[in-house]
């Protein structure tokens, strides 16, 4: 929930203009353009253009840019609004209809302009904004996904609804997954803005108050459709004492989301059903498509979504991406944040005098992080239309002897069939229950590890001021008594991802919910025995937090990943605690093996002519999955085991090791090396050889 306390004396109709405006300015100026936050020690010290300075959003943006220390604030608006813009803090205003507007802006900024917020965002404004950028290039933040002609000017756009951190759609067809990092930023920025409004440092755009209460809202929408009052786009409608005003915001333009064309070369002769549309399921689908096999993803949610804020991939995982499909790796690199150094640093967080426990070289641009949602966004762009079925909650699987296909049953009463079913449905996998069999077996479900995490995203300028450059732009792990913390940059380096783990001897109170409400006070208490650096990290977390329970499959591992023509992959097969940061990477390894096996199986079936083959199609596919099980089971189970143990080592809970630096370093090194240095090419060779043996080809 996003709430701001309105100062006494501010009229409701003024207050109702703040919600969308504050959110949009926060996203545009600070998340997209990277301005330092008001009140921080850093200052912008560069010029900025606010296109549409007399709009509600533009009026706020001018004031925030001034508070962030911009050396020169330029705006565009009608001449009759020049005085208004000046009163807000604009240094110069230009008429956007003036044919010489661009040149005047360039002259005013001495051709050095590199930051622009377009608060109108039409095709015409986009071209003007891009043209006004100086000769060294820059960035324009739009309110819509617009394009311009200049290649040296980066185009970004924001959508205020993402600040709620929830899935939403526009017109039922344009779907946007949850972005938890936007919610965390919005909470922080709204709290900051609350103080600025209370101190009188932010003035609202004058609203227009309509008549006829809620009924008048429709008149307001109609006026905006007809192009009336486009600049003052805030409306209040008096509806009574209990609800005095309503803020109506409408956009007359539509969003166009590009779709990847259907892959006409992908075959449907081998029907593959993937249950689950997270990173594990989508990477597998792309790997199959690369090999000419068109799968169908059955996702129980209404859209693609990933739980959690940050994610990183170790060197082995990046290698597996390239094997699976080089475009997957390219997509990952497009959204990653480059570390300040190519080292992973483990620190003793319990000693006031800083001490490095261990450092490991990651390789060039190794183990980089990104926002989970950003990576998934990039991946799904490559999925052909028709690859995904949303709102499909699996309830049963039927794999009968003699049947040509496996049947899937969903909670909405629908069914589907496929030759192969692969469960990528996460830690609470329904497919895992089928593979293991029996009624309510312990291995059907993950179990609480007696650790939970506080997660938070900290604005980078705030983190930089508190910790310095090295501790903010490079991956750090802080070890200590019964707790440990991880930090690394995400969101283009604008945010520091903080994950603070705590040991909990109690049982988890709610078996249905993996997150429960908490506060910063809880986190501060959990890390009170740590040094000032770690306490400073914890102190930067938001006041309202969640406790994220760490569940895994260590206590009751799946004895097999395969049953007949059904298998499980990723967290569905081997959910591990996140202390190695390797769970998603192992899912990519799984996907590489599965994609190659199904490709080999399909090639074998094409050559042998299914109708006359000595080995029936169903048997070939079973042997492919048996090969997958043989290749992946031991390594995946080891990951679950080592992840549990390394978490205990990080927190001084191994009696033989404690927090002894030499012993900790030795454990960290060999365990990480076994993950990072894994020979993916050799794994693929072993896979091919074993499958051929299964078929009697060698």
Swiss-Prot record:
Enzyme Commission identifier(s): 1.-.-.-
SUPFAM superfamilies given in the database record: FAD-linked reductases, C-terminal domain, FAD/NAD(P)-binding domain, NAD(P)-binding Rossmann-fold domains
Active site: 455
Pfam families xref list: ADH_zinc_N (PF00107), FAD_binding_3 (PF01494)
Pathway: Secondary metabolite biosynthesis
Positions contributing to NADP(+) binding: 54-57, 78-81, 96, 279-280
Class of enzymatic activity (EC top level): oxidoreductase
Disruption-associated phenotype: Does not affect the accumulation of azaterrilone A.
GO terms classed as biological process: secondary metabolite biosynthetic process
InterPro entries: ADH-like_C (IPR013149), FAD-bd (IPR002938), FAD/NAD-bd_sf (IPR036188), FAD_monoxygenase (IPR051104), NAD(P)-bd_dom_sf (IPR036291), Trans-enoyl_RdTase-like (IPR047122)
Residue runs in coiled coils: none
GO MF annotations, alphabetized: FAD binding; oxidoreductase activity, acting on NAD(P)H
Binding residues annotated for FAD, in chain numbering: 299, 312, 372, 571, 584
Induction of synthesis: Expression is positively regulated by the azaterrilone A cluster-specific transcription factor tazR.
UniProt keyword terms in alphabetical order: FAD, Flavoprotein, NADP, Nucleotide-binding, Oxidoreductase
PANTHER family: FAD-BINDING DOMAIN-CONTAINING PROTEIN-RELATED, HYDROXYLASE, PUTATIVE (AFU_ORTHOLOGUE AFUA_3G01460)-RELATED
Annotated family: In the N-terminal section; belongs to the zinc-containing alcohol dehydrogenase family.
Function: Dual trans-enoyl reductase/FAD-dependent monooxygenase; part of the gene cluster that mediates the biosynthesis of azaterrilone A and other azaphilones, a class of fungal metabolites characterized by a highly oxygenated pyrano-quinone bicyclic core and exhibiting a broad range of bioactivities.
Name of the protein this chain belongs to: Dual trans-enoyl reductase/FAD-dependent monooxygenase tazHJ
Native organism: Aspergillus terreus (strain NIH 2624 / FGSC A1156)
């Amino acid at each position: 929930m996003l709430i701001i306390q309105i100062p006494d004396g501010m009229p409701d109709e003024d207050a109702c203009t703040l919600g969308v405006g504050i959110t949009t300015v926060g996203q545009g100026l600070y998340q997209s353009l990277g301005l330092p936050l008001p009140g921080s020690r850093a200052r912008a010290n560069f010029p900025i253009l606010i296109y549409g300075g007399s709009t509600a959003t533009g009026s706020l943006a001018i004031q925030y840019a001034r508070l962030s220390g911009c050396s020169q604030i330029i705006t565009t608006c009608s001449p009759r609004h020049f005085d208004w813009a000046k009163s807000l803090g604009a240094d110069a205003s230009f008429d956007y209809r003036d044919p010489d507007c661009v040149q005047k802006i360039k002259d005013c900024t001495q051709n050095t302009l590199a930051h622009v917020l377009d608060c109108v965002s039409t095709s015409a404004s986009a071209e003007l904004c891009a043209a006004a950028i100086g000769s060294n290039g820059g960035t324009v933040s739009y309110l819509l996904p617009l394009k311009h002609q200049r290649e040296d000017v980066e185009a970004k756009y924001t959508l205020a609804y993402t600040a709620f951190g929830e899935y939403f759609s526009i017109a039922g067809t344009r779907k946007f997954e949850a972005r938890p990092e936007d919610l965390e930023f919005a909470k922080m920025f709204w709290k900051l803005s609350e103080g600025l409004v209370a101190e009188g440092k932010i003035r609202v755009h004058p609203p227009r108050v309509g008549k006829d209460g809620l009924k008048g809202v429709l008149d307001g929408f109609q006026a905006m459709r007809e192009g009336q009052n486009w600049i003052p786009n805030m409306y209040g409608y008096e509806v009574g004492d209990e609800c005095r005003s309503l803020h109506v915001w409408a956009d007359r333009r539509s969003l166009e989301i590009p779709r990847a064309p259907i892959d006409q070369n992908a075959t449907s002769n081998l029907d593959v059903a993937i249950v689950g549309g997270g990173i594990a399921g989508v990477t597998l689908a792309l790997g199959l498509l690369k090999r000419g096999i068109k799968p169908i993803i059955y996702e129980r949610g209404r859209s693609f979504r990933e739980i959690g804020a940050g994610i990183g991939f170790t060197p082995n995982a990046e290698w597996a991406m390239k094997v699976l499909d080089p475009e997957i790796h390219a997509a990952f690199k497009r959204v990653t944040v480059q570390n300040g150094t190519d080292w992973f640093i483990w620190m003793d967080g319990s000693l006031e005098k800083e001490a490095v426990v261990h450092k490991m070289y990651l390789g060039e641009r190794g183990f980089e992080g990104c926002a989970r949602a950003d990576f998934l966004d990039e991946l799904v762009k490559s999925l052909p239309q028709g690859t995904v079925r949303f709102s499909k909650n699996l309830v049963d699987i039927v794999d009968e002897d003699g049947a040509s296909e496996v049947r899937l049953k969903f909670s909405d009463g629908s069914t589907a069939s496929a030759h192969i079913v692969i469960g990528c449905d996460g830690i609470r996998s329904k497919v895992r229950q089928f593979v293991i069999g029996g009624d309510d077996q312990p291995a059907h479900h993950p179990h609480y590890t007696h650790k939970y995490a506080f997660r938070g995203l900290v604005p980078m300028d705030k983190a930089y001021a508190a910790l310095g450059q090295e501790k903010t732009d490079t991956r750090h792990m802080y070890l200590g008594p019964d707790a440990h913390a991880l930090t690394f940059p995400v969101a283009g380096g604008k945010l520091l991802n903080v994950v603070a783990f705590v040991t909990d001897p109690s049982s988890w109170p709610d078996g249905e919910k993996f997150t429960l409400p908490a506060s910063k006070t809880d986190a501060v208490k959990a890390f009170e025995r740590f040094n000032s650096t770690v306490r400073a990290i914890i102190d930067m977390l938001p006041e309202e937090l969640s406790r994220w329970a760490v569940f895994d499959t260590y206590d009751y591992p799946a004895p097999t990943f395969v049953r007949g023509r059904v298998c499980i992959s990723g967290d569905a097969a081997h959910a591990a605690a996140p202390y190695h940061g390797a769970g998603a990477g192992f899912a990519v390894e799984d996907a590489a093996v599965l994609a190659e096996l199904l490709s080999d199986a399909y090639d074998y079936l094409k050559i042998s002519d299914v109708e006359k083959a000595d080995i029936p199609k169903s048997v070939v596919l079973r042997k492919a999955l048996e090969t997958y099980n043989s290749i992946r089971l031991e390594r995946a189970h080891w990951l679950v085991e080592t992840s549990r143990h390394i978490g205990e080592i990080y927190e001084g809970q191994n009696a033989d090791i404690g927090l002894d630096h030499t012993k900790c370093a030795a454990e960290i090194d060999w365990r990480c090396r076994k993950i990072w240095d894994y020979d993916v090419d050799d794994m693929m060779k072993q896979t091919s050889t074993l499958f051929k043996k299964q078929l009697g080809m060698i």
